[in-house]
Design a protein with these regions (language model features):
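C-terminal terminal-subdomain/extension
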Residues: 62-110
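Compact nucleic-acid interaction/catalytic patches
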Residues: 16-60
Length: 110
């Protein structure tokens, strides 16, 4: 697993209305790719876009069935074993957008 990869869960998740969902890994590479670490931090993907600075819009070209939003305000810790279906990897541009959205959501200044 790597930062910027998109996965779909098979399990129905209570926080998602008991439906499977899409998640983007946002953990740093050392954590995401380390087989000894069982969890990663993920940003959930929602079908509804709200136009927030803390979200980025993605679509079919990014591996999603329809236009959706990666929401950085709702980061969640996921077991790697629940991220069962690899979908795609974000493009370099989408990764830059995600980094800006994460920075905004977490109020980080560099």
């Amino acid at each position: 697993m790597n930062c910027g990869e998109i996965y779909r869960t098979q399990e129905k998740i209570p926080e998602r209305g008991h439906k499977p969902g899409f998640y983007v890994i946002v953990s740093r590479e050392f954590i995401a790719s380390n087989d000894d670490v069982s969890t990663v931090i993920c940003a959930p993907v929602y079908r509804e876009t709200l136009g927030l600075r803390s979200e980025i819009v993605v679509g079919v070209e990014d591996g999603f069935p329809q236009e959706s939003a990666i929401r950085c305000d709702f980061l969640t810790l996921m077991l790697k074993s629940k991220l069962t279906h690899f979908v795609a990897t974000l493009s370099s541009e989408k990764q830059r957008q995600l980094n800006r959205a994460l920075s905004y959501a977490l109020q980080l200044t560099v």
